[in-house]
UniProtKB/Swiss-Prot annotation:
EC number in record: 2.1.1.-, 2.1.1.35
Binding, S-adenosyl-L-methionine: 190, 218, 223, 239, 299
Keyword tags: Methyltransferase, S-adenosyl-L-methionine, Transferase, tRNA processing
Molecular function in Gene Ontology: rRNA binding; tRNA (uracil(54)-C5)-methyltransferase activity, S-adenosyl methionine-dependent; tRNA binding
UniProt xrefs under NCBIfam families: trmA_only (TIGR02143)
Family classification: Belongs to the class I-like SAM-binding methyltransferase superfamily. RNA M5U methyltransferase family. TrmA subfamily.
GO cellular component: cytosol
Protein name listed in UniProt: tRNA/tmRNA (uracil-C(5))-methyltransferase
Reaction(s) the record says it catalyses: uridine(54) in tRNA + S-adenosyl-L-methionine = 5-methyluridine(54) in tRNA + S-adenosyl-L-homocysteine + H(+); uridine(341) in tmRNA + S-adenosyl-L-methionine = 5-methyluridine(341) in tmRNA + S-adenosyl-L-homocysteine + H(+)
Length: 366
């Protein structure tokens, strides 16, 4: 695979290899055959970041080879959305011969949606001034004249200039209902939107008929908690990053959801609060004891669950675990399988043609 060529003819083979690998890893805990969810074979990534290389009068996107660290010129990127590919060409054309926008530009980040909106961030090793803003506004207007629905942001050390806004609103069809998700530049969002829809629909399927309330740790912009709200009486979700919490609050309102509460708190802190180890001002007005948590949802970072959170989640009858790293999932399952058994197992091909796998498990108390 090269940045400008995807081996689409190998898609089925690489997916089959992942299925075998996941089954092998899960064998100590379950003999289930994974439910498999396929990605589009190209144009599946909704975000991409590129370094910018200055080569005489020329200017182009590059990435670095992970093994050799050599730079690779990238003029098109079929893994990314068609909108990103259009913008890559348009941005280079707009910046190449503009001294103000070009000078000390070292990176461009792209974030797009299925609803065809984009935020493009230009990163600089220089101070950004009014002249930069004027030139950036002219570029933005020129891009919009090409029917590109784009917002531009300039970034430098301790500086962020958003010409209009630093977010876009994604609209996803999820099990017959349109969900609106505000996505903020430089905050985590699911990279593969088509796969995200399938993950949300799978999570809805495995939790249908649920009783009681849902607790979610690491909720981000509310991606899962808002979609799952229809299956539960109430949802309480935690998130530590301020921009993600703000986006989640917006998304609650935008989707007319009235049974979800988001609190800004680390998973480890929430564990302490639930165990009565310490009190938090942030929980004032929230009666934790009034919740009947029957299901806990976790979508942890690549490092998986820490040992304290492992112990905490074992207290719940059902654990829904989405993992971006099956190795740490299996490490967590060494503990969780003492009290819970695997009821459902899914493989989501979030990153085709790479070693990475995303998977989901539903665990129920033995």
């Amino acid at each position: 695979m090269t940045p400008e060529h995807l081996p689409t003819e190998q898609y089925e083979a690489q997916l089959a290899e992942k299925v075998v690998r996941l089954q092998s890893m899960m064998a100590p805990f379950s003999d289930l055959v994974p439910e498999v969810f396929r990605s589009p074979v190209s144009h599946y990534r909704m975000r991409a970041e590129f370094r910018i290389w200055h080569d005489g009068d020329d200017l182009y996107h590059i990435i670095f080879d992970q093994q050799t660290k050599s730079r690779i010129r990238v003029d098109s990127f079929p893994a990314a959305s068609e909108l990103i590919n259009q913008l890559m060409t348009a941005m280079i054309a707009g910046v190449r011969n503009n001294p103000v926008l070009r000078h000390k530009l070292f990176q461009i980040d792209y974030l797009t949606t299925l609803s065809n909106q984009a935020v493009v961030s230009l990163l600089y090793h220089k101070k950004l001034d009014d002249e930069w803003r004027q030139e950036a506004e002219a570029l933005r207007d020129a891009l919009r004249a090409q029917n590109l629905n784009v917002h531009l942001i300039g970034r430098a050390t301790k500086t962020k200039i958003a010409l209009d806004q630093d977010y876009i609103d994604e609209r996803l069809p999820v099990a017959g209902k349109e969900m609106i998700y505000r996505q903020v530049e430089n905050s985590f969002t699911q990279p593969n939107a088509a796969m995200n829809i399938q993950m949300l629909e799978w999570a809805l399927d495995v939790t249908k008929g649920s009783k009681g309330d849902l607790l979610e740790l690491y909720c981000g912009n509310g991606n899962f908690s808002l979609a799952l709200a229809r299956n539960f009486d109430r949802v309480l979700a935690t998130e530590i990053a301020k921009p993600s919490v703000a986006a989640a609050q917006y998304n609650i309102t935008a989707n007319h959801i009235d049974n979800v509460q988001i609190i800004r708190m680390a998973a480890e802190e929430f564990t302490q609060a639930m165990n009565g180890v310490r009190e938090f001002n942030r929980l004032q007005g929230i009666d934790l004891k009034s919740y009947q948590f029957e299901t806990i949802f976790v979508d942890p970072p690549r490092s998986g669950l820490d040992s304290e959170t492992e112990k905490m989640v074992q207290a719940y009858p059902r654990i829904l675990y989405i993992s971006c790293n099956p190795e740490t999932l299996c490490k967590n399952l060494e503990t969780l399988s003492q009290t819970h058994k695997v009821e459902r197992l899914a493989l989501f091909d979030q990153f085709p043609y790479t070693h990475h796998m995303e998977c989901g498990v539903l665990l129920t108390a033995k």
